[in-house]
């Protein structure tokens, strides 16, 4: 995602007075959580607003070269969405945007997908983008049976490392279904995300 006027939270902030003058009472956001896609329905990290919508304060690394499908080579993307400075700055900026929306008497609705996540999700980490980070992240369930997120997903066989036998939404391996029946932790984690958004 490149910067473009109106396509990020700064664009929304810049147009709030205009929206208020139009009589807008509610602003509905598609998912804003970290995700590799434009639509963001394949959430990678429920704890943070995507820096591509929020703030990128640390930016370095390489883009994926044409024809290269190994996402571990997309170091610019990885740095943007795994560095705490970018993630925290984006959450803080979103809180500011919500505060400004509320100051104008408008409400906010945030869309999110809680049935499934994306294969990039730090709990699954099928794309191995959290593997080599600075020990800030636990190994994903795709990588290791011992992952603390193992029960967040339903696996059909014991084929670690890189177990591709998990349940996906409509069978899509890029959209791993979350295993609410097998994990109280995933329910708790989502409840925490809901509470964070409700506090804004």
Locations of the language-model features?
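Substrate-binding/active-site clefts of carbohydrate-active enzymes
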Residues: 1-17, 21-25, 32-195
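N-terminal low-complexity segments that are often proline-rich with Ser/Thr-Pro
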Residues: 197-200
